[in-house]
Regions:
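Extended amphipathic coiled-coil helices
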Residues: 2-168
Length: 168
């Protein structure tokens, strides 16, 4: 709490008016310190099996959505460790060794897509898909994996573009 006193003296036709004004200001600021994790060391505790299963029901959107949920989630700013500083430049910035470093945009995004594909193909998760998804959902997931693993150019380009849009 800080206080201040102001004395104003005004003379008007030999009349003296004294005014005392007291005001008190209270600073109720909250300072939050957020420690951002290095790229590759994200907190994934909040990414539940149920959330991943939900993503797998729409596998063709799963990777960009998982990237957004991991790296651009407002509720988890500690994972906001990759930036696209200028959409016209071929670089991204990642937090590495507690410093922001420039990396090649295309290779970094493709690595990120690969990482999320691996997360979605975790053995226990695949077992859940096999045991609980309808044949139609299983087929859709298998088509997604086949296209990804066969490195189909159109499919890979679409994933890249959707991931880039998440970053903008």
């Amino acid at each position: 709490i800080s206080g201040s006193t102001t004395n104003n003296n005004t003379t008007n036709n030999n009349n003296c008016n004294n005014m005392n004004k007291n005001s008190f200001n209270t600073d109720n600021s909250t300072h939050n310190t957020i420690n951002i994790n290095n790229y590759g060391y994200e907190n994934k505790d909040y990414i539940t099996k149920d959330y991943l299963v939900k993503l797998l029901k729409e596998p063709f959107q799963a990777i960009p959505k998982l990237i957004e949920y991991t790296h651009f989630n407002k509720e988890h700013p500690e994972n906001q460790n990759i930036k696209l500083p200028n959409k016209k430049q071929p670089y991204v910035k990642i937090l590495k060794g507690d410093k922001w470093v420039y990396m090649d945009r295309k290779s970094t995004i493709l690595d990120l897509i690969d990482e999320k594909h691996c997360e979605l193909n975790d053995i226990p998760l695949l077992k859940h898909v096999e045991d609980n998804f309808s044949d139609n959902l299983q087929d859709r997931f298998e088509r997604f994996n086949d296209r990804y693993l066969n490195d189909e150019k159109d499919f890979t380009n679409q994933l890249y573009k959707e991931t880039e849009l998440v970053m903008i």
